[in-house]
Regions:
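Walker A (P-loop) phosphate-binding motif
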Residues: 45-93, 190
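Conserved beta-strand segments of the P-loop GTPase G domain that flank and frequently precede/overlap
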Residues: 11-12, 176-181, 209-210
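Hydrophobic anchor at the start of a short beta-strand
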Residues: 9, 88-91, 205
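Redox-cofactor binding/interface segments in oxidoreductases and associated redox assembly factors
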Residues: 1, 10-11, 143, 178
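Conserved C-terminal guanine-recognition region of P-loop GTPase G domains, centered on the G4
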Residues: 2, 6, 12, 20-23, ...
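Flexible, glycine/proline-enriched loop segments at strand-loop-helix junctions
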Residues: 10-14, 63-70, 115-118
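ATP-dependent carboxylate-amine ligase catalytic core
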Residues: 82-163, 170, 175, 184-191, ...
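Extreme N-terminal, non-catalytic leader segments
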Residues: 4-60
Length: 263
């Protein structure tokens, strides 16, 4: 139906070859346009890559999440939008691999999910950010970290926080935002999380963000997918206030209506 009205079809996710072929045929039938936003695999000659990490002089803001569905991507866009409205030339390296259609937003590099040695992913990501710094000359770089920072449980390990380990070893952040689930959590949990980030990743959490989804804790120790439920604004504010009171206002904790107060 879109093609009949001269609309573009944007391909931003990997699909089966048969589905892709059908899509191409439809585009040709209606003289439409298929725009492939997916990054192609690159042939990398490791012998030409200096096995070193470069210093990054541009301020780096990292946005990580305790797990999936913590609104990391929306938070990345919101922080970018706020900084741009303040007049800063801001670039975002997204936690997603299909963000090429957004202004000044780079997708997660394809090599991060490729079959190359893990140590080279760290080196290549560092070189990727360095090249961006030199060519784009941004005033701020926002980096979104995909996935979780550690396994949710032994039954639901996710990707074991591999991307977090690789990216935080590739580039040291100047400011780190940790996105949490909208569950009732204790001050002890927050303090222990800060210790984990400090000693496992050599990174300090500067503030926390409460996402819009709560995790169904009864589903994290089963083999079926973890379930989540949306929480309303009133409950989110109450969670935030309860946690701040328990922590005696030592930590900065924000919700989506308070993005401009981050930091």
């Amino acid at each position: 139906e879109f093609l009949k009205h001269n609309k573009q079809i944007l391909l931003s996710r990997h699909i089966q070859k048969e589905t892709y072929d059908d899509l191409v045929q439809l585009v040709n039938t209606y003289s439409g346009e298929l725009v492939n936003l997916l990054q192609s695999e690159q042939c990398i000659n490791f012998n030409t890559i200096p096995a070193k990490l470069y210093d990054i002089y541009t301020p780096i803001i990292d946005i990580a999440g305790i797990g999936e569905k913590t609104d990391k991507f929306l938070l990345q866009l919101a922080v970018k939008d706020y900084l741009e409205r303040q007049g800063y030339h801001t670039i975002l390296v997204s936690s997603r691999d299909n963000s090429l259609y957004l202004d000044n937003v780079y997708s997660l590099p394809v090599f991060m999910n490729g079959g190359i040695p893990p140590e080279y992913k760290i080196i290549l990501y560092n070189h990727f950010i360095k090249k961006m710094e030199e060519e784009e000359k941004p005033e701020v770089i926002i980096i979104g970290i995909p996935g979780e920072i550690m396994p949710i449980s032994k039954v639901q390990p996710g990707h074991f926080g591999i991307h977090a380990f690789q990216i935080l070893n590739a580039v040291n952040p100047d400011f780190l935002i940790m996105s949490l689930y909208g569950n009732e959590i204790s001050g002890k949990y927050v303090k222990e999380l800060k210790q984990i980030m400090k000693y496992k990743f050599v990174a300090n959490i500067d503030c926390f963000y409460l996402g819009n989804y709560a995790q169904d804790v009864f589903t994290v120790n089963r083999s079926r997918p973890i379930e989540y439920f949306l929480i309303n604004e009133k409950d989110k504010i109450q969670l935030r206030d309860n946690l701040k009171n328990e922590l005696e206002y030592e930590e900065k904790i924000y919700i989506d209506t308070e993005i401009e107060m981050l930091g």
